[in-house]
Design a protein with these regions (language model features):
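Carbohydrate-active catalytic/glycan-binding domains of CAZyme proteins
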Residues: 1-167
Length: 167
C-alpha cells in the first residue's frame, strides 16, 4: 500500500506495556503514529500515560483483562492471508499481583483496515485470552528422536540452532 510500518513496544515491561505502530511513505521517516495507539495493551481505554516511571506499579492493572503487561509483538501472516501478533504478557495472581509464571507468550488475531492500519480482529485493543484459530490445515511435525547414540557420521537437523544451516 506504499507505506513502511514500524511496530514498537512502549511503557516498559510493566502493567502499562503495550504495542504501538507508526507508518511512513519513506523508510527514513518521518513516521505518523497510529491514531488508535496502542494497538495491543492490557491497560483500560485507549489513552494511557506513556513513559511513566511507575510503569511497573499495579495502578495500571486492569481487572477486566486476564492478560497483563502485553507488549513486544511480532507480526505473523499466514499463507491464507490471516494476520496475527504474537506478544509477551503475564498473568498475575490476585491480590498480590505477582506474576509467578514470569513472561508468557500470547497471540492476537488482527486485521488491516481500509485506511491501512493494523487492528485487533474485534476492533478493541485489549489483549484477549482466547482467539479464533487459523484456518490453516494441520501440518504434522516430524517427531524428534528421544534417544541418540551418536553413532552416525552427521548430527541430525534437530541439533542445529535457528539461523545455522546444516552443511
Amino acid at each position: 500500500n506504499g507505506y513502511y510500518y514500524i511496530m514498537c513496544a512502549e511503557g516498559g515491561t510493566g502493567y502499562n506495556h503495550c504495542v504501538t505502530m507508526g507508518r511512513s511513505k519513506n523508510v527514513w521517516g518521518p513516521y505518523e503514529g497510529d491514531p488508535m495507539n496502542p494497538i495491543v495493551t492490557s491497560v483500560s481505554g485507549i489513552s494511557y500515560e506513556r513513559q511513566d516511571p511507575d510503569h511497573l506499579k499495579p495502578k495500571y492493572y486492569n481487572p477486566d483483562s486476564v492478560l497483563q503487561k502485553s507488549g513486544h509483538a511480532s507480526y505473523v501472516e499466514t499463507s491464507l492471508g490471516e494476520v496475527y501478533l504474537v506478544h509477551l504478557c503475564a498473568r498475575p495472581f490476585a491480590p498480590e499481583l505477582r506474576c509467578t509464571l514470569g513472561r508468557e507468550t500470547a497471540i492476537q488475531k488482527m486485521k488491516w483496515t481500509e485506511d491501512g492500519w493494523l487492528r485487533m480482529y474485534d476492533d478493541d485493543n485489549l489483549a484477549k485470552e482466547y482467539v479464533e484459530e487459523s484456518r490453516l490445515p494441520e501440518y504434522p511435525v516430524p517427531q524428534i528422536p528421544s534417544f541418540d547414540d551418536f553413532d552416525g557420521e552427521e548430527l541430525g537437523n534437530w541439533y542445529y540452532a535457528p539461523r545455522i544451516m546444516p552443511q
